[in-house]
């Protein structure tokens, strides 16, 4: 029986062994790679929406088709929840936006912020009533003690308004995804999203939500109504919530008009003196987007709000607006208020979007000035309407597209 032929050794020595497998990436690098992949999913959805809007121009049609694309929406919801659970929670500002909302609500509803705002309104009204007759009088007005006791009627109105705030704070979280406010005891939370990531969030297209007449019920009956909502939500009564939250919501929409519609619906859903909390991503230093934030402030206040608080984190702007009138007071004839809710990406061309798909495009300061030129006629508003807080800052930050998705 013949022996099996032996394999010939390779020239120059013994047979080479296969190379060892590459070492696995360190945990931190692996986490960052996963975060980049997830943020890429989210940003690609935003880019496609903006691209379609530029190509088609019909934002109703684009949004309707987007809401019917269940596969993309589910992928988006899973990516957002994963980012929030496994990445943002490990950084101070990923959790900070939720904590900021809670802090503002506690300050306003529980620690005297609302009372101070109402008393400030009363002082303004009193000063206005004194100065108006003086404009038409030939003699200077009689000098009285500055800001004496306010009228009993106004004090009673303030007390009644504050008493209505007792109990849980009714909060609507629009674009909730994973219902982050549910864990806070002080809130009766309703989270809505076009594709919820968890069962506790209701399915709802906020842009097309129908607003009905307000409920004429006691507070406990309204609370019971909210606990028995049917899924999906197609309509809600007006003046139902103490707080409406837009956390990273408005920049999702490709059209400024859609952002405007959202703010208008928030005004209709809020009780008088309720809060609209708006958080939008931005990694640039504070003053670089000062013109944009001033534009947003004027547009939102035109609906019947006053800004109560403003903060700048390294990756986002955070604003709280107080509803000061029951009716929307905006004059769309003389001012293009919807167009004032712009974001930097609104000015990108399709080529810019394609470029940003492969690398991070950083706009120059000169380009920023050119984009903001159309809003140069806006009046100066260096302080908050209610809080008097300055918007100045000298902390340097660096800009990324949708930077909040890649917190480091």
From Swiss-Prot:
Q: Which portions of the chain have biased composition (kind: Low complexity)?
A: 1-16
Biased segments, Basic and acidic residues type: 28-37
Compositional bias segments (type: Pro residues)? 17-27
The UniProt keyword set, sorted, is:
Methyltransferase, S-adenosyl-L-methionine, Transferase
Molecular functions (GO terms): methyltransferase activity; protein-containing complex binding; S-adenosyl-L-methionine binding
Positions bound to S-adenosyl-L-methionine:
97, 175, 193, 205-206, 247
Disordered, as annotated region: 1-37
The UniProt entry, under Gene3D superfamilies, shows: Vaccinia Virus protein VP39
Entries under Pfam families matching the protein: Bmt2 (PF11968)
Keyword Nucleus applies: no
InterPro entries for this protein: Bmt2/SAMTOR, SAM-dependent_MTases_sf
Sequence similarity: Belongs to the BMT2/SAMTOR family.
- Subunit field text: Interacts with the GATOR1 complex; interaction is disrupted when SAMTOR binds S-adenosyl-L-methionine. Interacts with the KICSTOR complex; interaction is disrupted when SAMTOR binds S-adenosyl-L-methionine.
Outline what the protein does: S-adenosyl-L-methionine-binding protein that acts as an inhibitor of mTORC1 signaling via interaction with the GATOR1 and KICSTOR complexes. Acts as a sensor of S-adenosyl-L-methionine to signal methionine sufficiency to mTORC1: in presence of methionine, binds S-adenosyl-L-methionine, leading to disrupt interaction with the GATOR1 and KICSTOR complexes and promote mTORC1 signaling. Upon methionine starvation, S-adenosyl-L-methionine levels are reduced, thereby promoting the association with GATOR1 and KICSTOR, leading to inhibit mTORC1 signaling.
Q: Which HAMAP family match?
A: BMT2
The name this protein carries in UniProt is S-adenosylmethionine sensor upstream of mTORC1
What are the top taxonomic ranks of the organism? Eukaryota, Metazoa, Chordata, Craniata, Vertebrata
